[in-house]
Amino acid sequence: MLKKTIDVSKKARYYMLGNPQSNISKVWFVLHGYAMLSEFFIQKFKNLDDGNTLIIAPEALNRFYINDYYSRVGASWMTKEERKTDIEENINYLNLLSKKIFEEIGHTNFKLNILGFSQGGATACRWIFASHMKIDSLVLWASDLPQDTLIEK
């Protein structure tokens, strides 16, 4: 048996609180945990929406049913299957999304903050390390630094 892959285009969804406009002084990317959806996760950050803050909740690219009744759906940033590919696709997705958001804001004079919850924390770390982006703060909520980001290069 021969395993092969093909690149495909996929729509990725994300939710925002606030509008990407010139008065933005703070940007938060908030990455949800395993089996969560960004639509609900972003609700936890409503109090940050002060007119000068933009909150973006990207949703992991892999959705699945989380119960036996097919009534609840969650999303996962990665599993052990094709893990490296999932990580690369997450980084590409987050890079494209952040570039789009920054262009919409129209300036770079804002504080960039990233919060990752659980599995989203590992994804946030990998994104930051792979992208070499400058951030003002990283918040890991119920998460650790992934071992593969601690390897000296």
Regions found by a protein language model. Name each.
Residues M133-P146:
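A conserved short beta-strand
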Residues K26-V27, K111-N113, S137:
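Structural motif
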Residues T123-W127, T149:
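Hydrolases whose catalytic domains are alpha/beta-hydrolase-1, hotdog thioesterase
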Residues V8-H107:
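Serine-hydrolase catalytic machinery in alpha/beta-hydrolase-like enzymes
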Residues Q43, R126-A130:
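Active-site signature of alpha/beta-hydrolase-fold catalytic machinery across serine-
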Residues E59, L115, V139-A142:
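Alpha/beta-hydrolase-fold catalytic nucleophile elbow
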Residues L115-G120, A124:
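Gly/Ala-rich beta-loop-alpha elbow adjacent to hydrolase catalytic centers
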Residues Y15, D144-K153:
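The feature captures the conserved acid-bearing segment of alpha/beta-hydrolase catalytic domains
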